[in-house]
Amino acid sequence: MDFKEKQLSSKLIYDGKVVKLYVDDVKCPNNNISKREIVKHNGGVCVLAIVDNKVILEKQYRYAYDEVLYELPAGKLEINEDSYEAGLRELEEETGYKAKSLINYGKMYPTCGYSNEIIYLYVAEGLSKSQRNLDEDEFIDIEFVEIDKVIEMINQGIIKDAKTICLISKYLLANKK
């Protein structure tokens, strides 16, 4: 079966700083016409950094959920920015650690039902202490947590962030003994 839908029309509803919202008319595989509300986003990066056998976790308030969340260092891609370079930049800006290199752990689609956002996943190598340089609207605490404790935090629902859970899981699966 051909699952692909054909776009018939697209209307920009909202053009924001971070996202654009479109309402598209599509022709479904069964020839029915349907609407798709699509959030277009430039994408982001997520970086797992381990210092002295401890994972760098960030703790920050997330307005959309009205709660403080634990996450791995991450951030938005600038327009036409390479995800590898963005990973290096975000890690240093948010944590004050500079990576010599990043290992590509693939990508994830965090909200595939209604958004085109892609988050690129990396693991940092060759870390050295540098300087934090947070954006003026970022307020982030850094914690260094043993990997076993991170797994426990995921299993207990303390870590809820999808990109963080995804990258930690991929890392553990790739490095299981």
Which ranges hold each PLM region?
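Conserved Nudix-box catalytic region and its N-terminal flanking loop in Nudix hydrolases
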Residues: 2, 45-89, 132
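Nudix hydrolase/Nudix homology domain
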Residues: 2-5, 68, 79, 137-177
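Acidic, metal-coordinating catalytic segment for phosphate/diphosphate chemistry
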Residues: 9-46, 51
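Short, solvent-exposed loop/turn elements at beta->coil junctions and helix N-caps
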Residues: 11-12, 106-111
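A generic structural signal for well-ordered coil/turn residues at beta-strand boundaries
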Residues: 15, 20-22, 43, 115-118, ...
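Active-site-adjacent beta-strand/loop module that shapes the phosphate/pyrophosphate-binding cleft
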Residues: 22-29, 111-130, 143
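Short loop segments at secondary-structure junctions
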Residues: 29-30, 51-54, 61, 124-129, ...
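The catalytic Nudix box helix
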Residues: 72-104, 122, 134-137, 146
